[in-house]
Amino acid sequence: MATLLVADDLVPIRQMVRITLSTQGWTILEAKNGTEALEVARAQKPSLILLDVDMGPGPNGFDVCKTLKADPGTKDIPIVMLTAHESESDRAIGFAAGATQYLTKPFGPLELIDTIRGILAQT
């Protein structure tokens, strides 16, 4: 089964995503900020990463995405941005940073699961 990293500064979001995704049999790792997301991604090499954009002090989700895509050890890990940043310019920044998919909050559990399943089926 897949291992997923959820990076969001808000505990309720991480909990909701963890509960939703664990019903699929996936192992869920968590990070509360960009720095922790980079550390966990490099150490654990998850199958897929879910990244918020605004995660408090430190690198934001766009920066984390760019950094991971530039790292030979993590460049092939698919990244889904999960964020309230819904403008077309934000989406363009996310995809330019290397995101595989871009979902805006609020998102539905089935939308999230279907998105992840689709990406994992291609890897």
Question: What are these language model-derived features?
Answer:
Residues 25-32, 40:
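Short hydrophobic/Thr-rich beta-strand motif most characteristic of the beta2 strand and flanking loop
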Residues 39, 62-75:
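Short amphipathic alpha-helix used as the core "switch/output" element in two-component signaling
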Residues 59, 63, 86-103, 114:
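Alpha4 helix (beta4-alpha4-beta5 surface) of REC/receiver domains from two-component response regulators
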Residues 45-47, 73-78:
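His-Asp phosphorelay/catalytic-motif detector in bacterial-type signaling
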Residues 44-50, 55:
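Active-site beta3 strand of CheY-like receiver
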Residues 107-116:
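C-terminal output helix
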Residues 15-23:
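Charged docking surfaces used in two-component/phosphorelay signaling
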